[in-house]
Amino acid sequence: MPRVKRGTKRRAKRKKILERASGYYLTKSKLYRSAKESVERALKFAYTGRKQKKRQYRSIWIVRIGAAAKLNGLSYSRFISGLKKAGVELDRKMLSEIAIHDPQAFAVLAEQAKAAQPAAA
């Protein structure tokens, strides 16, 4: 069995890491070990960032819907509860888009939510 020295494989592996680290500061873009640590860390942050992005968008939508609901005399929770009872099946993303781009349509939705709420005791 011939001996394998991995010359090309190792070079390709190092080159891939150093290419990913291009633009990093000082030795993090030049030295393999530092670059590898930085790239791994960056990939970990990127992974968690992709998860956080979904949470952040949802919270932005909720803030927008809450602000628009306040303008129509409802709290966010009463607005969402009223829509569920009225059978309106719009997700928060669409509701926030409607609140921004079509306030009249949002007012109609708010009226539907108010009508579906039981009378306050």
Swiss-Prot record:
GO MF annotation, one: rRNA binding
Keyword ATP-binding attached: no
GO cellular component, one term: ribonucleoprotein complex
Tagged with keyword Ribonucleoprotein: yes
Gene3D superfamilies: 6.10.160.10, Ribosomal protein L20
InterPro entries noted in UniProt: Ribosomal_bL20 (IPR005813), Ribosomal_protein_bL20_C (IPR035566)
Keyword line: Ribonucleoprotein, Ribosomal protein, RNA-binding, rRNA-binding
Pfam families linked to this entry: Ribosomal_L20
One GO BP annotation of this record: translation
Family of this protein: Belongs to the bacterial ribosomal protein bL20 family.
Its job: Binds directly to 23S ribosomal RNA and is necessary for the in vitro assembly process of the 50S ribosomal subunit. It is not involved in the protein synthesizing functions of that subunit.
Listed name of the protein: Large ribosomal subunit protein bL20
Species annotation: Koribacter versatilis (strain Ellin345)
The gene coding this protein: rplT
